[in-house]
Amino acid sequence: MFIVREIFHLQFGRYREAKQLLDEAMKNQLLLQPQESRILTDFSGEGYRLILELPYETLAAYEADLKKELNETGWKEWYEKFKQLVRSSEREILKQVTKMGKNT
């Protein structure tokens, strides 16, 4: 299992606009939305971060979804609006080595 984290460092005070654009993109199926995906925001640390956390069984599955997303009709137009709210971004790809919790 791999966890892909798309981390967006937003411009100060632009969280609400960015969240509205994310909601719009999800409604219009412009973004990757594998089962058990999460949208996170900071509670501590550097402020104005928006994090998309995407679980994938394989990196090949992630690459296939990413290719599909980038070719989605309307994605480029949406992204042009979204990136105006972003100061910087980064991507983390993590390998899950064990699952913790009651249901393991």
PLM regions and their residue ranges:
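Residue-level signal for secondary-structure boundary sites
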Residues: 14-16, 60-62, 99
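Short hydrophobic/aromatic beta-strand micro-patches
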Residues: 9, 53-55
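Short, low-order "capping/linker" segments at domain edges
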Residues: 92-104
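An amphipathic, aromatic/His-enriched active-site/gating alpha helix that lines ligand/cofactor pockets
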Residues: 20, 24-38, 43, 55-93
